[in-house]
Amino acid sequence: MDFSDYHRRAPVTLALVALNIVFFLWTEVNGSSEDIQNMYRWGAMYGPAITEDHEYWRLVTAAFLHFGISHIANNMFLLLLMGDRLERALGHVKYLILYLVSAVGANLFSMVLDLRLDPETFCRTVSAGASGAVFGVIGGLLWAVVRNRGRLEDLSARQMMIFAGLSFYYGLTAAGVDSKAHFGGLVTGFVMCMFLYRPKRRGNWAEVWQKVI
């Protein structure tokens, strides 16, 4: 990937990365990014705080907080890797809308699933991270690639499906990863892109399927 003019191609992606880094440094300076109480204080996800105390803003703020340096490094690398392509495809404003709605959708999906299926986890889990929103970007790219006759710039439908599958598999097998939020973000981003993306060229589904397989 050529990063020489990244700031012109994807200013929103760079701004999101910068915001995440600023929030990370803030939580480190004012406590620790790996301290659960400190993260809760600055806006991490906690189900009962939303359902009982109506602190709905946590659905957004949690997406800008990270537990430790490796957590933010992994998420920001993926965002830089994927974000510029989708930002160029959608435009800056639509891309930002998709990112933020995916963050909310990811956190909401995870919270509701825990509330319905695992009340114990719902009551004791504090979570944070941009990965739900990043998976929204991946979901958006999946739709954009498929809708654009199986290719978007240097990305093919097959590449995107393999990448999405491997990323989701890593989340399922790694400890402490909220795979429910990943899935919620992926689906939210995919659906949002169905409404926001207007391809320059269109192809029939048989042609797209041939490129996938």
Task: Place the predicted regions along the sequence by residue.
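A detector for small-residue-rich transmembrane helices and their helix-helix packing motifs
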Residues: M1-I213
